[in-house]
């Protein structure tokens, strides 16, 4: 059996500081903005020359927060309520033999300075500090397949949770938005996805998250 070693090329800077509440797929929270910081020796402007002409990117990354748990031959996909089991290769589960993930994100801007290359991203679904091992431009002609079938995940999950704020919180958000634009929208979109475990959906647990 062959083994391979890969170098980290960058790190994600994201509003998600922990796994809880991170969208289960990219694009579900469109106001989730973040950055990919390339690290030496890959933080060269030449390495991203022409990338600004693409609207979206594939990011290949490492599931660094779950890799110690090892892989599992079957998992419980959230889309099936967290109860039915599927083979790990029929899911996007983090518990894989090789803990590699892929995320399709919006490329908003490429910023190059003397010693840094930063990609500004939108529709992000990655936790802060995620190690990145590769990036590739998204090619619509080859990768957009409208006739494809996707079993239990044919369409995006509905954002069903109603989200409201008290008057006091709304006042605080107005102040915070001066520093964090779109913060209110971001919170609404995250909570509307109901980030609780799939088997808790629809329950009134009374818990505070």
What positions do the PLM features span?
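Mixed-charge, low-complexity intrinsically disordered regions
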Residues: 1-99, 112-116, 124-209
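Short, surface-exposed coil-to-beta transition loops
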Residues: 101-103
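Conserved positions in beta-strands of structured domains
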Residues: 13, 105-108
């Amino acid at each position: 059996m062959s083994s391979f070693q890969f170098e980290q090329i960058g790190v994600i800077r994201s509003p998600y500081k922990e796994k809880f509440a991170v969208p289960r797929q990219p694009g579900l929270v469109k106001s989730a903005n973040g950055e990919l910081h390339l690290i030496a020796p890959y933080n060269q402007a030449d390495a991203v020359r022409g990338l600004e002409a693409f609207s979206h990117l594939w990011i290949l990354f490492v599931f660094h927060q779950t890799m110690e748990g090892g892989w599992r031959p079957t998992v419980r996909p959230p889309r099936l309520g967290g109860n039915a089991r599927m083979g790990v290769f029929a899911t996007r589960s983090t518990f894989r033999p090789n803990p590699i993930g892929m995320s399709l994100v919006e490329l908003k801007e490429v910023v190059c300075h003397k010693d840094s290359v930063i990609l500004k991203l939108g529709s992000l679904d990655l936790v802060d500090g995620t190690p990145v091992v590769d990036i590739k431009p998204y090619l619509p002609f080859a990768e957009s397949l409208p006739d494809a079938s996707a079993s239990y995940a044919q369409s995006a999950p509905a954002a069903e949770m109603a989200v409201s704020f008290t008057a006091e919180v709304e006042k605080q958000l107005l102040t915070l938005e001066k520093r964090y634009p779109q913060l209110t929208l971001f919170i609404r979109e995250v909570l509307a996805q109901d980030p609780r475990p799939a088997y808790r959906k629809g329950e009134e647990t009374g818990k505070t998250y």
